[in-house]
Amino acid sequence: MPEPMVATKQMIEQIFDGAATSYDRTGPSIFTQFGTRLVEQMPLTPGARVLDIGTGTGAVLLPVARRVGSEGHVTGIDLSGAILQEAERAVRAEGLTNVELRKMDAEHLEFPDQTFDVVICAFGLFLFPDMEAALREMNRVSKPGGYTGVSIFGKTPPPFNPGWPILFQQIAAYQVGVRMPQPIAYAPEEVEALLSQFGFRSIETRSEMNDIIYASAEDWWAFQLTLGTRATILRMNEETRARFKDEYLAKLRPMFRQDGLHLSVAVVYAMAQR
């Protein structure tokens, strides 16, 4: 069986450009939930300068901007110009004036050394072809004693269990897979080891289990078109895609409860200092 194609930066940009208007707006808006949870754990103070890497539509950016106040400043960066436009709309809707949005590669941050009090990257590490470069850059732009926070899917159980394991089995059978540049799930000790390797200290990790409910099969399928899985789905021609979807959702329907499809999602949160 052929190996799945590995997503390039250009592909990742195209994925999120295409998904921008529906990103985190299908089903329960999990990235807003998880972004808020990450921000709650960060030692943010009024007046802080913060960098949000892979800002998306603002799941972390918006609560951070509220926390640091008008004297603080938040810079959100992303590879996707279209998704930054959605973030800009959200910023304007809240009337926030302490936010800057920039199209930028996390592996080549365009900031001087020791610029930020806090650096945050929510669900972004697995999107970086050169994760080591991104982590080095995160450390470089942090002030001495500054804080870095990351979140990523946990390994146990597999993310979105049982929805994703069944999906990935079917993708393998169809031989159309596009995988992200890095593994998408990590154990807490693996996240700690990564941060330690690139100069971070005083590392704290915690894993939290979440029961995520999608009210309908169509909501869950629509969610797949807002993630890296979008690239795999769109590689199929229209006829194959329709057959794939029907087969996949047929496998899931017996698992639905009265209120929808329950999926287990472990999230690893980590905080460290430079």
Model-derived regions: residue spans:
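Conserved class I S-adenosyl-L-methionine
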Residues: 2-48, 59-63, 83-86, 93-94, ...
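Short glycine-dipeptide loop
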Residues: 47, 70-71, 142-147
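A short acidic, Gly/Pro-enriched loop at the edge of an enzyme's catalytic core
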Residues: 107-118
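Conserved Class I S-adenosyl-L-methionine
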Residues: 3-12, 30, 57-59, 182-274
